[in-house]
Amino acid sequence: MFSKAFLSAALLGAAAVEGHMMMAQPVPYGKDTLNNSPLAADGSDFPCKLRSNTYQVTEENTAAIGQSMPLSFIGSAVHGGGSCQVSLTTDREPTKDSKWIVIKSIEGGCPANVDGNLSGGPTSTGASKFTYTIPEGIEPGKYTLAWTWFNRIGNREMYMNCAPLTVTGSSSKRDEVPKEKTVEKRSANFPPMFVANVNGCTTKEGVDIRFPNPGSIVEYAGDKSNLAAEGSQACTGTPTFGGDGNTAGSSGSSGSSSGSSSGGSSSSAAGSGATAPPAPAVSSTLVPKPSQSSAPGVFVPTGSPAQPTHTSAPSGGSSSGSGSSSGSNSGSSSGSSSSSSSSSSSGALTGSCSSEGTWNCIGGSSFQRCANGQWTAVQQMATGTECTAGQASNLKIKATNLKPRMLHEMRHRKRNYHNHA
């Protein structure tokens, strides 16, 4: 009798000649020249499967903030599913240096929850259909959307299709596609996109990976038994590029932070012990600024620190953990950092803080924030900007004088941006 693994491998081999998968909706850039193969293993066509006329706009996709939009695929070689992300950049012709922010992660069952491949060949539309939503905190403007996929079975690959997207302001109730079935909402934040299998960091075969920084919206569409163990590494090796999204936040992924549960990550039938993977450490809202005043791909911090909200957990077996949550937050606002905070020689603060929402600008070139009772990791200011040093309730940002070479590069990028917008 053949094993399940053998049958899965046989199905994958039989479908190898049928190609792989492509994004159908939103309509990708250069649809006529896009093929269904993964990115090159050496990363030479990252991002967006670089080729001739990569960023030709076949059809401009439009989405309003808060509107649920379809995410669908064409093809049958789903390689046992896997995990996917939906990300945005303000660059309309992204490069390896572009900054991507994650607006949704799908851990397991993407693009389909099967053991091998689907039938139907490269024109099949039988893969699962998902949705994504442009969240609050994203400004109206022109973006590039990326769908990335890390397959569970087969060669270690990364798939990436990109699409032009115009984001409009939110509106009243409208016709929307159905909402996600099992979605985990976390503190509002937009972490960097995960990159692997093209940069020296390799994912493990046979599991649906958990993303180190999955972001605010996480959907679980696969079998719990296929999901990687909580706290496990998503990939091994040192990434040569795109490694910003490959490291978990300082809160870690062990589930030991306040408000997490020890034990399993599924909810019990009785409703107690429901737990969720931990939220990333940096919880201040990051807002993309696609305006002409800043270079494409720059994201400027703004808004108030968001509080984590757990609305659901992966479906499956009962949880072995207690599911207890301290639920406590520091409510005091003294205007200065807590005495338990420690300061480094660079001016960065670590540890707990009581001045919730306070910004700490370090030498004008980097910043951090008191969020959820802890100082966040230090982040660098965007090129061409600086902040006013010290602690304050608002982060004061101003433009700086740029070197002629930097100004030339920014103007060149802006010209390209508007020519293709």
UniProtKB/Swiss-Prot annotation:
| Required cofactor names | Cu(2+)
Leader sequence segment:
1-19
EC assignment? 1.14.99.-
Glycosylation sites per record: N117
EC top class, in one word?
A: oxidoreductase
Question: From start to end residue, where is composition biased (Low complexity)?
Answer: 247-285, 315-349
Q: How is the cofactor bound?
A: Binds 1 copper ion per subunit.
Gene Ontology molecular function, alphabetical: metal ion binding; monooxygenase activity
Which keywords, in A-to-Z order, does the entry hold? Carbohydrate metabolism, Chitin degradation, Disulfide bond, Glycoprotein, Metal-binding, Monooxygenase, Oxidoreductase, Polysaccharide degradation, Signal, Zinc
Polar residues biased stretches: 304-314
Name the PANTHER family on file. Answer: LYTIC POLYSACCHARIDE MONOOXYGENASE (PTHR36182:SF2), PROTEIN, PUTATIVE (AFU_ORTHOLOGUE AFUA_6G10930)-RELATED (PTHR36182)
Name it. AA11 family lytic polysaccharide monooxygenase
Q: What is the species of this protein?
A: Aspergillus oryzae (strain ATCC 42149 / RIB 40)
Designated gene of the protein: AA11
